């Protein structure tokens, strides 16, 4: 249900003069290669990235970013109305509690009633922190129906990020490199599917010549190699070698690394003379 508040504010942004990507969305729609569900997700993605600064959802809700209701049109006591007007997190939870699902059922008449009667009784910041798992980093989840083209949507996100990162290299909202985590139990079927990202035509979402330029700059690494034992008691990790080949990392742009979750769990990263150490210590050496 949080999505409804985000989507509502997203529509307002796209209808306003503050939106800076009207031409880009028009281009994507006229190109006619992306499906409606994919375009809808791209709109939300760009809204969160540009209008919301790619901030964590808990922070955005606490700041009242998605608040939209007119308090003067709701039956409230003067005290409650003033409290909600002065506390955006409280107002956000109040608006959330009044949302209705597809069956017309209200999210929570109980929360709405508590806020109306005694708005000071609830810890609004804690509610949103708990709702979004107390994480401090940005974490956006996009859920599409089966067959709607999730892999190509991922590719579109990657190219859109690179497009804006190339124009605004110091803007932290846009990534320069990417890591895709495939479910380990399904890596035999999922990772080959993710390789279709390489075949995605960026001109579906980005005009030329920028699309072709970014396509040339994109590099794709599948980190699926097993460790190899050397003559010593140290183990060489060929996946580390693949990443090390892209040094210097300060200038790295356009790398897409695909792996299963376990492969990114590291005890430490060692460097020697400014280069990544490609060997891992044995269990005895770690002790």
Report residues per predicted region:
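RecA-like P-loop NTPase motor core of helicase/translocase proteins
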Residues: 1-287
């Amino acid at each position: 249900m949080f999505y409804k508040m985000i989507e509502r504010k997203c529509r307002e942004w796209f209808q306003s003069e503050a939106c800076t990507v009207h031409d880009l969305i028009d281009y994507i729609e006229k190109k006619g290669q992306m499906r409606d569900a994919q375009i809808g997700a791209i709109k939300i993605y760009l809204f969160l990235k540009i209008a919301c600064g790619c901030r964590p959802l808990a922070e955005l809700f606490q700041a009242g970013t998605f608040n939209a209701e007119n308090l003067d049109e709701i039956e409230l006591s003067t005290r409650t109305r003033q409290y909600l007007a002065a506390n955006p997190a409280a107002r956000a939870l109040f608006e959330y509690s009044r949302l209705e699902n597809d069956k017309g059922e209200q999210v929570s008449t109980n929360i709405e009633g508590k806020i109306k009667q005694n708005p000071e009784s609830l810890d609004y910041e804690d509610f949103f922190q708990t709702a979004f798992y107390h994480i401090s980093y940005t974490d956006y989840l996009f859920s599409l129906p089966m067959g709607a083209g999730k892999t190509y949507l991922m590719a579109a996100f990657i190219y859109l990020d690179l497009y804006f990162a190339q124009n605004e290299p110091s803007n932290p909202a846009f990534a320069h490199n990417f890591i895709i985590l495939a479910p380990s139990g399904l890596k035999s079927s999922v990772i080959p599917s993710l390789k279709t990202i390489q075949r995605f035509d960026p001109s579906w979402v980005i005009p030329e010549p920028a699309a072709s330029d970014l396509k040339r700059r994109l590099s794709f690494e599948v980190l699926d190699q097993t460790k190899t034992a050397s003559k010593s008691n140290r183990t060489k990790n060929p996946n580390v070698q693949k990443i090390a080949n892209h040094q210097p990392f300060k200038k790295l742009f356009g790398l897409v690394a695909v792996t299963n979750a376990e492969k990114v769990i590291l005890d430490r990263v060692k460097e020697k003379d400014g280069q990544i150490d490609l060997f891992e210590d044995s269990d005895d050496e770690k002790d």
